[in-house]
């Protein structure tokens, strides 16, 4: 699964743009990324793209 560190996430949306499965959305209210782990294929694109290293993907 992929997890978002809310303290590190700036809500920039880079991960949303990079996710090939559209498994990430931005929670406008909280200002952070949210991963739908049912859709996530653990490819690591979001983790690689995140400028704040706020997402970790674990197999």
Swiss-Prot record:
Q: Which UniProt keywords apply?
A: 4Fe-4S, Electron transport, Iron, Iron-sulfur, Metal-binding, Repeat, Transport
An example Pfam family from this entry, by short name, is Fer4_7
Task: Answer yes or no on keyword tRNA processing.
Answer: no
**Names of the cofactor(s):** [4Fe-4S] cluster
Q: Which residues form the 4Fe-4S ferredoxin-type domain?
A: 2-29, 31-59
Put simply, this protein is called Ferredoxin
Q: Briefly state the protein's biological role.
A: Ferredoxins are iron-sulfur proteins that transfer electrons in a wide variety of metabolic reactions.
Q: Matching PROSITE patterns, A to Z?
A: 4FE4S_FER_1, 4FE4S_FER_2
Query: What InterPro entries is this protein classified in?
Result: 4Fe4S_Fe-S-bd, 4Fe4S_Fe_S_CS, PSI_iron-sulfur_center
| Cofactor binding note of this UniProt entry | Binds 2 [4Fe-4S] clusters.
Residues annotated as binding [4Fe-4S] cluster 1 are: 9, 12, 15, 50
- Which residues are noted in the entry as [4Fe-4S] cluster 2-binding? 19, 40, 43, 46
Which GO molecular function terms does the record list? 4 iron, 4 sulfur cluster binding; metal ion binding; oxidoreductase activity
Disulfide connectivity?
none
- Organism expressing this protein natively: Methanosarcina barkeri
